[in-house]
């Protein structure tokens, strides 16, 4: 906190002597040189808690350690010797000139550094103005324009997502309706297939009946043929009997003609012939009636079987046409279902791709917004850092100004002429000691900031002696 400067006596350092050497260690020399140390601090770094040190009059950046100054008005200065060589004054003047030359060089360096700091401050102020303009532009125009643009694009994306959601719901409803239609058609197809199986079974039974009827018809035809053969045989037999009877009648007639005396035989033959003719006619009539009745029955049965067969064929053809039409309808519905399912899959894939693209766009826009926010925060931090650097540079400039003012005031003081001093002998033991301590006031200022805003500021004063 304090910087001490060790003062050495120029007189003892240059001349020495037994008088001075025999003095106790508590004695002090009164011809001294003053040294001054300048400490230049760098720019303060921004932090959550900063401590700014300032001292009076020069501040923490200029620590001054002062030794006893040689004043021309110091009373009671006496030396042990009556006469002193004035070359001592020349040596002191030479050393003082060297010190002044060194101080001038140091001041020149300080001025150069001060000019560099001023240029740096001006450059930082220009950068600060540029950043402030960019920040205002980002806050004013960029925020509203980008915000409106992002909001409009987000609204458009939400509208498209809602439209796609509605389209998806509509397609799902159509898919459900088509699924119900397909299920209904499948049930109808099952019913038609059952009816087809029943028709085929009925047709098979009808075919069996037709086969049975055909067999019966063949049997009846064989019976009719056998009956016709029997009738023909009976007719032939009847004709032969008639011929035999006629031959017998002729023979009897001849005999009757020959034997006129027998009239009763002719009447008997006539009676026998009539009886045979009546029996033959009766048998022929009965045979014809039985044949006609059997033929009518067989014809009627054949007609019935033909009607049933024709009806069965018609029903079979009708069922076949229905099965073909239903098969074509099922195939068409299958094709429609496949096309709708393919369209639904394509729409789902397109919707998934578009949704992924929209999600990517939303993510990219959110990343851009986050990057813009981070960039704005970075600009704000840089601006705050520049403000902190500017404050530190302002403090250093004020410190340098005070140092320069102190140096100018010190340079403007009149310098004593050592050649005109009247050195007289005096008792060093009786001389009062000159106070070699300098008082320094230390100001400790603590500033706490958060997000670029000052939240707490405290100041403490300390007095130190050197």
From Swiss-Prot:
Region described as Coil 2: 269-407
Compositionally biased tracts (Low complexity): 1-13, 20-30
Region (Disordered): 1-30
Domain (IF rod) ranges: 103-411
Coiled-coil ranges from the UniProt annotation: 96-131, 154-245, 303-407
Carbohydrate-modified residues: 7, 33-34
Chain intervals for the UniProt region annotation (Coil 1A): 96-131
Glycyl lysine isopeptide (Lys-Gly) (interchain with G-Cter in SUMO2) crosslink location in chain: 104, 120, 129, 139, 223, 262, 294, 313, 373, 439, 445
N6-succinyllysine modification, residue list: 120, 129, 188, 294, 445
GO molecular function term, any single one: double-stranded RNA binding
Subunit structure, as described in the record: Homomer assembled from elementary dimers. Identified in complexes that contain VIM, EZR, AHNAK, BFSP1, BFSP2, ANK2, PLEC, PRX and spectrin. Interacts with BCAS3. Interacts with LGSN. Interacts with SYNM. Interacts (via rod region) with PLEC (via CH 1 domain). Interacts with STK33. Interacts with LARP6. Interacts with RAB8B. Interacts with TOR1A; the interaction associates TOR1A with the cytoskeleton. Interacts with TOR1AIP1. Interacts with TOR1AIP1. Interacts with DIAPH1. Interacts with EPPK1; interaction is dependent of higher-order structure of intermediate filament.
UniProt protein name: Vimentin
Organism: Macaca fascicularis
Taxonomic lineage: Eukaryota, Metazoa, Chordata, Craniata, Vertebrata
């Amino acid at each position: 906190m304090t910087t001490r400067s060790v003062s050495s006596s120029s007189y003892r350092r240059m001349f020495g002597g037994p008088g001075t050497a025999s003095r106790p260690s508590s004695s002090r020399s009164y011809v001294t040189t003053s040294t001054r140390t300048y400490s230049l601090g760098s720019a303060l770094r921004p932090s959550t808690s900063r401590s700014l040190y300032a001292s009076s009059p020069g501040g923490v950046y200029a620590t001054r350690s002062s030794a006893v100054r040689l004043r021309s008005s110091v009373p009671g200065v006496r030396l042990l010797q009556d006469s002193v060589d004035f070359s001592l004054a020349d040596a002191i003047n030479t050393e003082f000139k060297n010190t002044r030359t060194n101080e001038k060089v140091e001041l020149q360096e300080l001025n150069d550094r001060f000019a560099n700091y001023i240029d740096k401050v001006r450059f930082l102020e220009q950068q600060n103005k540029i950043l402030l303009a960019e920040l205002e532009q980002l806050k004013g125009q960029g925020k509203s324009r980008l915000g409106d643009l992002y909001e409009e694009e987000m609204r458009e994306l939400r509208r498209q997502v809602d439209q796609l959601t509605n389209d998806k719901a509509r397609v799902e409803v159509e898919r459900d309706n088509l699924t119900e239609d397909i299920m209904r058609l499948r049930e109808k197809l099952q019913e038609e297939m059952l009816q087809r199986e029943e028709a085929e079974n009925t047709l098979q039974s009808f075919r069996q009946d037709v086969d049975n009827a055909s067999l019966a018809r063949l049997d009846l035809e064989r019976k009719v043929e056998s009956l016709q053969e029997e009738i023909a045989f009976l007719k032939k037999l009847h004709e032969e009997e008639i011929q035999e009877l006629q031959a017998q009648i002729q023979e009897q007639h001849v005999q009757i003609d020959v034997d006129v005396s027998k009239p009763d035989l002719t009447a008997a033959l006539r009676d026998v012939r009539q009886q045979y003719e009546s029996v033959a006619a009766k048998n022929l009539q009965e045979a014809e009636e039985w044949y006609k009745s059997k033929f009518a029955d067989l014809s009627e049965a054949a007609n019935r079987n033909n009607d049933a067969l024709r009806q069965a064929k018609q029903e079979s053809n009708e069922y076949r046409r229905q099965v073909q039409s239903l098969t074509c309808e099922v195939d068409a519905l299958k094709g429609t279902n496949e096309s709708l399912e393919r369209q639904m899959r394509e729409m789902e894939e397109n919707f998934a791709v578009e949704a992924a693209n929209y999600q990517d766009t939303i993510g990219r826009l959110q990343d851009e917004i986050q990057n813009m926010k981070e960039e704005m925060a970075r600009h704000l931090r840089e601006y705050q850092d520049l403000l902190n650097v500017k404050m530190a540079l302002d403090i250093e400039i004020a410190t340098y100004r005070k140092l320069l003012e102190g140096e100018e005031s010190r340079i403007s003081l009149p310098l004593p002429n050592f050649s005109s001093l009247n050195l007289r002998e005096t008792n060093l033991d009786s001389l009062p000691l000159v106070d070699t301590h300098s008082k320094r006031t230390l100001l400790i200022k603590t500033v706490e900031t958060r997000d670029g805003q000052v939240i707490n500021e405290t100041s403490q004063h300390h007095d130190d002696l050197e």
